[in-house]
Amino acid sequence: MQALIEISDKQYLVKAGDKIFVPKQKAAAGDVIEVKTLMQVNQADSALKAGTATIKVLEHVRDETIIVFRKKRRKRFQKRNGHRQHMTQVEVLSL
């Protein structure tokens, strides 16, 4: 069974046992969180229903570096910045 869950205004299509990266959550590593499911899809009877999903916070990490490069032509102005977004890895325990 798959479910469409919403975490921090983003939607993810997951099933039990999946590990996904989501925007940083305030929960500590090892905590269990309940999130709402927008829709559960069961291939056997094609039933659509809402409910809750249980996820476990595995760790807090930082995403890959995104390079931001700005340049003004003919003025010898160049600026290069890097940005790393904070992410949380979670595991879906049950739907």
Swiss-Prot record:
Disulphide linkage map: none
Molecular function in Gene Ontology: rRNA binding; structural constituent of ribosome
GO biological process, one term: translation
Record keyword Signal present: no
Membrane-crossing segments per the record: none
Recorded coiled-coil stretches: none
Keyword hit for Ribosomal protein: yes
Pfam family, one: Ribosomal_L21p
Keywords: Ribonucleoprotein, Ribosomal protein, RNA-binding, rRNA-binding
Role description: This protein binds to 23S rRNA in the presence of protein L20.
PANTHER family according to UniProt: 50S RIBOSOMAL PROTEIN L21, LARGE RIBOSOMAL SUBUNIT PROTEIN BL21M
Family: Belongs to the bacterial ribosomal protein bL21 family.
UniProt name for this protein: Large ribosomal subunit protein bL21
